[in-house]
Regions:
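Charged, solvent-exposed interaction patches on well-folded alpha/beta domains
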Residues: 1-152
Length: 152
């Protein structure tokens, strides 16, 4: 049909702001870049994403979190893909969680158990390092302690 024009419109819902080489981009959950933005003029409260290859892996991370510790997604402020192999999570209370390269869901289940047993969000814990399977190293404002978590 010579006088017919077909237009396909795909709407991408902004899920996060991705930082790369000094620029900021709106991305959707599957990591597709929607548009470059000026962060000073943007007011939505979206997740910050950093690290090489992080947009492509974001959806799997969010899926793992949603399965193992669903409430955690509500407190995520920033995620960073470290050295192309593992994630750091920063929560809205500035708590840093270091995930391992493998068995992320199990580590997130352990984190959930720690949150349920301790008042982590209200404590002076500033970092939880889960990079060693079955263990959580806690860093507090006035020193460092270790807390063992049995596998679930």
């Amino acid at each position: 049909m010579p006088s017919t024009l077909k237009i396909n419109v795909t709407e991408n819902d902004p899920y996060a702001i991705y930082f790369q080489e000094g620029k900021s981009f709106l991305i959707d959950l599957d990591g597709s870049i929607i548009t470059e933005i000026n962060l000073n003029n943007y007011e939505d409260d979206l997740l910050f994403v950093r690290g090489e290859n992080s947009p492509e892996l974001l959806e799997q991370l969010i899926r793992d979190i949603s399965i193992a510790f669903p409430n955690l997604t509500q407190t995520l402020e920033e995620v960073e893909f470290i050295e192309k192999r593992r994630w750091n999570l920063k929560l809205n209370n500035k708590l840093l969680v270091k995930l391992p390269d493998e068995k992320i869901q199990q580590s997130l289940k352990n984190l959930k158990q720690l949150f349920e047993e301790q008042e982590v969000m209200e404590s002076n814990i500033i970092e939880i390092d889960l990079r060693i399977q079955g263990r959580a190293a806690l860093k507090v404002l006035d020193g460092k302690i270790n807390y063992g978590i049995d596998e679930i």
